[in-house]
């Protein structure tokens, strides 16, 4: 039975597109119920539409604070029938209340091998350090940026 997934994204949606492509190839068993984007005009919106997946554009600047925004996002996730949340280039920290609404069901895709090179510049930081091996990490999200338990990692040779 596939995971019922909500995808939170802020930008171009390349991670989201990779998920869609993997589902279509039959190598990822998820049902993407909704994409929630916090930035109007982000390319992920077009990608979701092209894939036939509902996309809710929820501009975070239209809420008075992070807590009320995260409550609205959690409500949208629940209304879509999703039980797991994937952060795919989502450039916002989540509140403890959001994480508690989906305990051990929020994952992040990070473009570096954690615990090395956390943060929004992880890939660039790895390159700046001159690492010979880099990769990506999928991990559970907790209240500390890029800190939660690692689910899976993939290592590849670094290229300059």
Locations of the language-model features?
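N-terminal glycine-rich "phosphate-gripper" loop used for MgATP/nucleotide binding
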Residues: 37-38, 61-62, 66-67, 80-96
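Short, well-structured alpha-helical segments in soluble
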Residues: 71-79
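Short alpha-helical
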Residues: 14, 42-43, 64, 93, ...
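Donor/substrate-binding cores of folate-linked one-carbon enzymes
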Residues: 22, 84, 88-160
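N-terminal Rossmann-like dinucleotide-binding module
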Residues: 1-43, 47
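Short, surface-exposed acidic-centric catalytic microdomains
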Residues: 28-72
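Proline-centered loop/turn at the N-terminus of a beta-strand
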Residues: 4, 31-34, 54, 84, ...
């Amino acid at each position: 039975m596939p995971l019922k997934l909500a995808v939170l994204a802020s930008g171009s949606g390349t991670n989201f597109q990779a998920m869609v492509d993997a589902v279509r190839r039959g190598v990822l068993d998820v049902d993407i119920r909704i994409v929630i984007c916090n930035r109007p005009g982000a390319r992920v919106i077009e990608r979701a539409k092209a894939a036939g997946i509902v996309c809710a554009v929820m501009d975070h600047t239209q809420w008075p604070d992070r807590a009320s925004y995260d409550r609205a996002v959690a409500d949208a996730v629940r209304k879509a029938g999703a039980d797991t949340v994937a952060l795919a280039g989502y450039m916002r920290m989540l509140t403890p209340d959001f994480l508690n609404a989906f305990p051990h069901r929020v994952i992040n895709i990070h473009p570096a091998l954690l615990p090395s090179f956390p943060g929004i510049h992880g890939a660039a930081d790895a390159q700046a350090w001159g690492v010979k091996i880099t990769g990506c990490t999928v991990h559970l999200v907790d209240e500390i940026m890029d800190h939660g338990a690692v689910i899976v990692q993939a290592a590849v040779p670094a290229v300059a």
